[in-house]
A protein has these predicted regions:
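ABC-type nucleotide-binding domain
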Residues: 12, 19-20, 27-242, 246, ...
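Cytosolic ends of transmembrane helices, especially the final helix of ABC transmembrane type-1 domains
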Residues: 1-10
Length: 253
């Protein structure tokens, strides 16, 4: 009975993030300019903001990178863009539209998001790469894998792109998971790329080669990168440092 009550509670509870009853459209002619307008955020029940009065513009064709100490809110900041959370104050816009006014589905269709912890699904390599673009061609899949430096290990497997992937990617290494996650984002052809410390499991040589190829592929897109390694973001046109000194995190340019 207790279990049944819990299931009923989950099924009848409202989701924390909801779409407007009549959401607006981002439109087909947008370029993916992301702008934070005096954004503050605090977790539900918390007494202090994690992020406070953050303002910046990430322009198409340019890379905006975020650095800062562990726990300063870098991942929280980029997770506000796809609306994993909603801002407490201020607003985030893409091409001038408040992300809260757009349906979550349409918003996320414009984004290529690679999380800190790479996520793979049970299936094969091909289905994982084309997950965000199920109608994508074999050529698109191979191009994405090549840019992500994933062909290096895919080509050694007897079944190549049909090689099975266990749930969570438990049968591939951490670096291989990251490369497949990056390939999946590339194959989607998004306007906005978000890399949340997505290169940490790569060796230095692979990291450098991947970033060079990625820079060419994403030259017309808006790219946001959260990084621990300074070397990962030296090419960025805009580097923003998040500082946390016994007060909510703020931006330092």
């Amino acid at each position: 009975a207790v279990a049944a009550d819990r299931v009923d509670e989950i099924l009848t509870s409202e989701t924390a993030i909801e779409d407007r009853k009549t959401p607006e459209k981002l439109g087909e002619n947008g370029k993916g300019e992301v702008e934070f307008h005096h954004v503050s955020f605090r977790y539900p029940g918390a007494e202090e903001d994690v992020l406070h009065d953050i303002s910046f513009t990430a322009e198409p064709g340019k890379t905006t990178a975020f650095i800062g100490s562990t726990g300063c809110g870098k991942s929280t900041l980029v997770n506000l863009i796809p609306r994993f959370y909603d801002v407490t104050d201020g607003k985030i816009t893409i091409d001038g539209k408040d992300v809260r006014d757009v349906s979550q589905h349409e918003l996320r269709e414009k984004l290529g998001y690679v999380p800190q912890k790479a996520v793979l699904f049970s299936g094969d390599i091909a289905s994982n790469i084309l997950y965000g673009n199920p109608d994508g061609s074999e050529a698109e899949m191979i191009e994405a894998a090549t840019i992500a430096q994933a062909t290096e290990f895919i080509d050694t497997k007897p079944e190549k792109y049909k090689s099975p992937i266990s749930q969570g990617g438990s049968n591939v290494s951490g670096g291989q998971k990251q490369r497949l996650s990056i390939a999946r984002a590339i194959a989607k052809h998004p306007q906005v790329f978000i890399f949340d410390d997505s290169f940490s499991a790569l060796d230095y040589k692979t990291d450098v080669t991947l970033r060079r190829a990625l820079a060419e592929k994403t030259s017309g897109s808006t790219v946001l990168i959260v990084a621990q390694r300074i070397s990962t973001i030296l090419h960025a046109e805009q580097i923003l440092s998040l500082i946390h000194i016994s007060e909510p995190t703020r931006l330092r340019r």
